[in-house]
């Protein structure tokens, strides 16, 4: 039995977000094919995702130096507890499904803040004399990515730092990232929205059966 963490990184409701609609198709098919697996949904825009800032970095250094957790300020304790809970939730999963849009050629800022909760030296990778070593080998992820333009291939593919960034950072910590599902080009061809979404859902249906 596998534990799947379904991470939604869009503030838009499902009826507006086409990538979320495709992700719902993927999840429904996955559950049908894997009834004994558990799927936990994490909606980032409904979740406290602490930003890795000076306060948290200072608290981390103080704890490493021997300061007791209870000696930290109450608000810092609360933020660290939220941060650490996200870390442990991510590490406990076997598979990951990310759905996220392309914003200004990158990922949403809250998704980047979330990435910082699990890409941690000593947790998901470690430093060795031969360089960094991934610690999450054997886990699997799929990325479902929405964009108004077409960036998965063609002349604009080198512009994007969305799907390639998330794929790279997950591979860095050892996770096997299977081929992504793209929901793209609707802003270029609004009249083809239904066709584009249907094609992406068909890919999602097939991908879920193999995930």
From Swiss-Prot:
Cite the binding residues for FMN. Answer: 10, 17-19
Concerning InterPro entries, the annotation shows: Flavodoxin_fold, Flavoprotein-like_sf, FMN-dep_NADH:Q_OxRdtase_AzoR1, NADH:quinone_OxRdtase_FMN_depd
Task: Write down the Pfam families for this protein, in alphabetical order.
Answer: Flavodoxin_2
EC number per UniProt:
1.6.5.-, 1.7.1.17
Alphabetized GO MF terms? electron transfer activity; FMN binding; oxidoreductase activity, acting on NAD(P)H as acceptor; oxidoreductase activity, acting on NAD(P)H, quinone or similar compound as acceptor
Q: Which UniProt keywords apply?
A: Flavoprotein, FMN, NAD, Oxidoreductase
The source's superkingdom equals Bacteria
Cofactor(s) needed by this chain? FMN
Q: Which reaction does it catalyse?
A: 2 a quinone + NADH + H(+) = 2 a 1,4-benzosemiquinone + NAD(+); N,N-dimethyl-1,4-phenylenediamine + anthranilate + 2 NAD(+) = 2-(4-dimethylaminophenyl)diazenylbenzoate + 2 NADH + 2 H(+)
- Cofactor comment in the record? Binds 1 FMN per subunit.
What PANTHER family does this protein's entry cite? FMN-DEPENDENT NADH-AZOREDUCTASE 1 (PTHR43741), FMN-DEPENDENT NADH:QUINONE OXIDOREDUCTASE (PTHR43741:SF7)
Oligomeric state and interaction partners are given as: Homodimer.
Protein task: Quinone reductase that provides resistance to thiol-specific stress caused by electrophilic quinones. Also exhibits azoreductase activity. Catalyzes the reductive cleavage of the azo bond in aromatic azo compounds to the corresponding amines.
The record's family statement is:
Belongs to the azoreductase type 1 family.
Identify this protein by name: FMN-dependent NADH:quinone oxidoreductase 2
What organism is recorded for this protein? Listeria innocua serovar 6a (strain ATCC BAA-680 / CLIP 11262)
Give the gene symbol: azoR2
């Amino acid at each position: 039995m596998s534990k799947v963490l379904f991470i939604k990184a869009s503030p838009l409701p499902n009826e507006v977000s086409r990538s979320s609609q495709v992700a719902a198709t993927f999840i429904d098919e996955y559950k049908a094919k894997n009834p004994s697996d558990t799927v936990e949904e994490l909606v980032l825009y409904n979740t406290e995702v602490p930003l890795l800032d000076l306060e948290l970095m200072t608290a981390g250094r103080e704890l490493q130096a021997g300061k007791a957790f209870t000696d930290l300020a109450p608000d810092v304790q609360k933020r660290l507890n939220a941060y650490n809970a996200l870390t442990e939730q991510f590490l406990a999963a076997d598979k990951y499904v990310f759905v996220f849009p392309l914003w200004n050629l990158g990922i949403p800022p809250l998704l980047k803040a979330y990435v910082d909760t699990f890409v941690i030296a000593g947790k998901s990778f470690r430093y060795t004399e031969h360089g960094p070593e991934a610690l999450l080998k054997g886990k699997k992820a799929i990325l479902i990515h929405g964009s108004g333009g077409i960036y998965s291939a063609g002349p604009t593919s080198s512009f994007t730092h969305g799907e390639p960034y998330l794929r790279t950072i997950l591979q860095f910590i050892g996770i096997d990232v299977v081929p992504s599902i793209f929901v793209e080009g609707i802003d270029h061809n609004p009249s083809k929205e239904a066709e584009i979404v249907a094609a992406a859902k068909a890919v999602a249906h097939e991908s879920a059966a193999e995930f």
